Amino acid sequence: MKKKFRTKLKKLQYFKLTFLPGFCTKLLKKELVPIKKGKTSSFRIQLLEKQKLKYNYRLKENQIKKYFKYIKLLKIFNLIQIIELRLDATIFRLGFAKSINQARQLITHGFIFINSILVKKPSFILTEKDLIYINPKKFTIILICRINLFFRYYNKYNLYIYTLCVEYLKFKLQKEFYFKLYLFIPFDENLIKYYYKF
């Protein structure tokens, strides 16, 4: 476990970031010596941007390509907005899970319901007014989610969201409210487009 955690910190070091919210729950210490590499080519910069996105959201290559095709068809959303509408990303953003990995585990183990239907697919794309809630019979999972919500919102004095989510562990997805939860992640979508030649 310790070795796995160290490799995560090394990846952050490689990306020249101190934090990737969906990938690692710890901050990289600033005093660590950066990894020395050769000259940076344009391809390498594009590759790094793609890798940041891939590791943060736990995506595969074919999934990223598929989302770019959605952008061409819909002509509305950008890449990050489509990925943020995935069920695993939404569970993480709401604070029910500490990381994307934990959110994926909650979904695949059958603890998440959408509009009274059990969903076990982390890549499920949500729409406006979808009702998301935790299985009320799973008391240990409810306790874990409440603890996660406490550390996400209550300590930051965002009591409105905390009381909204924690009482019944339900959340109705609304466009205006949803994007207020969006946390800044340093992705350059244009560089990722150039990498995939879209």
Curated annotation (Swiss-Prot):
GO biological process: ribosomal small subunit biogenesis
Location of this chain's protein in the cell: Plastid, Apicoplast
GO terms under cellular component: apicoplast; small ribosomal subunit
Keyword terms, alphabetized: Apicoplast, Plastid, Ribonucleoprotein, Ribosomal protein, RNA-binding, rRNA-binding
Keyword Zinc-finger among record annotations: no
Pfam families for this protein: S4
GO molecular function: rRNA binding; structural constituent of ribosome
Annotated S4 RNA-binding domain residues: 85-145
Role: One of the primary rRNA binding proteins, it binds directly to 16S rRNA where it nucleates assembly of the body of the 30S subunit.
Subunit (UniProt): Part of the 30S ribosomal subunit.
Family label: Belongs to the universal ribosomal protein uS4 family.
Protein name in the entry: Small ribosomal subunit protein uS4c
Record organism: Toxoplasma gondii
